[in-house]
Amino acid sequence: MKTRSKCRFHNLFILGILTAGLSIVAYSENTGTVFLVRHAEKTSTARDAILSPQGRKRAECLANTLGDAGIQVIFATGFVRTQQTAKPITKKLGLKAVTVEYRDTAALVDKLRTMSDKTVLVVAHSDTLPAIIEKLGAGTVDPIKEDEFDRLFVFHFTGPNSGSVVTLRYCDCP
């Protein structure tokens, strides 16, 4: 009888260790990074404006800045300006930008969570980026001003529904 109790205890002990080990493995899979940028400068306030010459320079600068970051997936909304912002880096990396809906930030966040072990770039808009970052679990970031195009958010997954974000500036374009 004591042997059975010892055996059960031993099995429970082993099961506990395996469960703890799987938890550590699951947690360590959340090692991905998401770079998030607003589209570059545009020519006008029209709904689907194209990039200005300065915006095209910034898009090239983005490709140079993140070209060696190990990006595996690129998301951009369907607007011309976001696609144009993503184009130089997609070309440099040999990737295609996956088009996402402008306002459906929840769907994008769901996709990003399934890629929590990857390095991803998101090209979006001033009014959606803060919401995406908050929904990813990094808290709030300052609103993006209408004339602000140089913010580069670097989000790092720390768990399935959490992460940390650092805000950088890139490309001091004239």
Name each model feature, range by range.
Residues 2, 26-27:
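N-terminal pre-catalytic segment of deacetylase/amide-hydrolase enzymes
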